[in-house]
Structure formats: structure tokens, C-alpha cells
Curated annotation (Swiss-Prot):
Protein name: ATP-dependent protease subunit HslV
Phylogenetic placement of the source organism: Bacteria, Pseudomonadati, Gemmatimonadota, Gemmatimonadia, Gemmatimonadales
Residues engaged in binding Na(+): G164, C167, T170
Originating organism: Gemmatimonas aurantiaca (strain DSM 14586 / JCM 11422 / NBRC 100505 / T-27)
Gene label: hslV
Subunit (UniProt): A double ring-shaped homohexamer of HslV is capped on each side by a ring-shaped HslU homohexamer. The assembly of the HslU/HslV complex is dependent on binding of ATP.
Subcellular location: Cytoplasm
């Protein structure tokens, strides 16, 4: 009998007017059961200047965070280069290629979505979303960006709340981070 699928998360990052915020919900589901309600799937890196969040396997994501931190050390202050180098290694390394996670990384200048199949996307509108409720959070964030002057933190909170009201694999126990100055 196959193990039930672990479904975890909605992660959203928003950049606007020289500010950035990233957030994630707290739900982890195993099959059709909520296994955890207050998981934290976002963190700060590089002394608080870089924000990161993951969807997918926790162990795989932690491995990728370590690899990404190595890239940030090798290319200090250059989030685009560190992201490209991680995407290249993730895609070409036999072990890393099997990791089942997606990452969002962002600072005040750039934001990227990375995946193991070689995807490296920097959106035009400064909105990045991954995970089971990602499309709902992205749609809500786009509407809030177009129709309000809210700062990124508020957009992330409100959009993730909306996603949590729609997606059964997303809740409203939200963690939001901003870079430290």
C-alpha cells in the first residue's frame, strides 16, 4: 500500500516600492488528515537580508536551503547569480534532482521561484507563489497590488488568509517575514 501523499503549504512573496515580504501558512496534511497546524516554512538567510520559503518535502527543502546558503556565500550580495547557480546544480546533480521541493527566494531587489526541473522564474509583477494554495494567493495578491497601496507585508497576510479560506491544504496560521535592515 503506498504511503499517503504529504501536502504542505502555500508560500507567497511580494516585492513593492523597495520592500519585500514572504509568508507561509502553517498546515501540513498527510492524505486527507491535517497533521500539523503551525509549521513554519519561511526563514531569513544571509543575516536577515534574504527571505526564503519552501513547499514540498521538509527534509529536501532543508537540504536545498543549505545549498542555497552556500551559493549566497560564494556570490555575496548577488541573489540572481546565487539563484542561477543553485538551479543549475539542482538540475544537473543526480541526488539533488530527486529532491521534491520548490523554493522562493527574495530580497528587496529580486525574487525567484526555483524547482528541481530547472525552472528559475523572476516574475514581472514582484509576486511569487508556490504550493497547493499558490494560485489563490497569487490571484489575491495581484488584486491587492492593483487596487490598493498596501505594503508587501499586509498584501502577503491578506492574500494568504484568502488562500486559506479556499484551499483545503492551506490554513490561516500565517507566518510573515521581512528582511532585517
Amino acid at each position: 500500500m503506498p504511503l499517503p501523499q504529504v501536502r504542505a503549504t502555500t508560500i507567497l512573496a511580494v516585492r513593492r516600492n523597495g520592500q519585500v515580504a514572504i509568508g507561509g501558512d502553517g498546515q501540513v496534511s498527510v492524505g486527507d488528515t491535517v497533521a500539523k497546524q503551525r509549521a513554519v516554512k519561511v526563514r531569513t538567510l544571509k543575516g536577515g537580508r534574504v527571505l526564503a520559503g519552501f513547499a514540498g518535502s521538509v527534509a529536501d527543502a532543508l537540504t536545498l536551503f543549505e545549498k542555497f546558503e552556500e551559493k549566497l556565500e560564494r556570490y555575496p550580495g548577488n541573489l540572481p547569480r546565487a539563484s542561477v547557480e543553485l538551479a543549475k546544480e539542482w538540475r544537473s546533480d543526480r541526488v539533488l534532482r530527486r529532491l521534491e521541493a520548490m523554493l522562493i527566494v527574495a530580497d528587496v531587489e529580486h525574487g525567484f521561484m526555483l524547482s528541481g526541473n530547472g525552472e528559475l522564474i523572476e516574475p514581472d509583477d514582484g509576486i511569487l507563489a508556490i504550493g497547493s494554495g499558490g494560485a489563490y494567493a497569487q490571484a489575491a495578491a495581484r488584486a491587492l497590488m492593483r487596487e490598493t497601496q498596501l505594503p508587501p507585508r499586509d498584501i502577503v497576510e491578506k492574500a494568504l488568509t484568502i488562500a486559506g479560506e479556499i484551499c483545503i491544504y492551506t490554513n490561516t496560521n500565517i507566518t510573515v517575514l521581512e528582511p532585517t535592515r
